[in-house]
Design a protein with these regions (language model features):
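C-terminal beta-sandwich interaction modules and adjacent acidic
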Residues: 1-207
Length: 207
């Protein structure tokens, strides 16, 4: 049983593999490697929170006298096949908004301890989709429903072997008619759920 999962990112790879080496006289040895994928369920992430459900996340963002919105995500922790639900409320709209989009961003940080505090941070958009097209009005509510299952996601990793971390953020972006961008990021924690165990109904036991 391995402590860490396999991971292939922008600057970091964590591999488990079998290596076969065949020594040959008067020739270079023959070397072959076979990668092994390791995934760990993380039910303990919930248990560490004393089985308390993750509270909704409520945030406000705005520009004085021009824009004021509130947005809400139903939780702060999601498993990799979960659905993110939320709402966006427009309380004040005095700028001309063209559209609004939501992105899932993966941020990878790496750097060994003792390197004068130098760390490398790289971000990539996993998905970006349009929530709204056209100008909203005061009092409008826009729903959020994002299915995580089809996305290429990993759990949140924190200080793996004191070498790297992986975090995920929801990035809400509004673009006005002059192509100015207003955004707000919120970190969410992802974890891997244990696979479901199917039970036979024919008396043959569990398979």
């Amino acid at each position: 049983e391995k402590i860490h999962e396999s991971y292939a990112g922008l600057n970091v790879r964590l591999r488990y593999f079998l290596r076969v080496v065949i020594e040959r006289p008067y020739a270079m040895p023959y070397i072959k490697e076979l990668d092994i994928a390791v995934e760990n369920s993380q039910q303990s992430l919930v248990e560490l929170q004393n089985d308390k459900p993750s509270k909704p996340i409520k945030l406000e963002v705005g520009i004085e006298e021009c824009l004021h919105i509130e947005f809400e995500y139903d939780r702060g922790r999601y498993h990799l096949d979960d659905v993110i639900l939320g709402k966006i409320f427009f309380l004040l709209v005095r700028i001309k908004i063209k559209y609004m989009e939501l992105a899932v961003i993966r941020r990878e940080s790496c750097g060994a301890p003792g390197t004068n505090g130098v760390a490398y941070n790289d971000s990539e958009n996993i998905i970006r989709y349009e929530l709204m097209d056209g100008a909203p009005i005061k009092g409008e509510c826009v729903p959020i429903r994002l299915f995580l299952g089809p996305l290429a996601l990993t759990p949140t990793y924190r200080s793996i072997a004191n070498m790297f971390s992986v975090k995920y953020f929801l990035n809400l972006v509004l673009i006005d008619e002059e192509d100015r961008r207003y955004f707000k990021q919120q970190e969410v924690q992802l974890w891997r759920k244990s696979p479901e165990v199917e039970t036979s109904t024919t008396g043959l036991g569990t398979f």
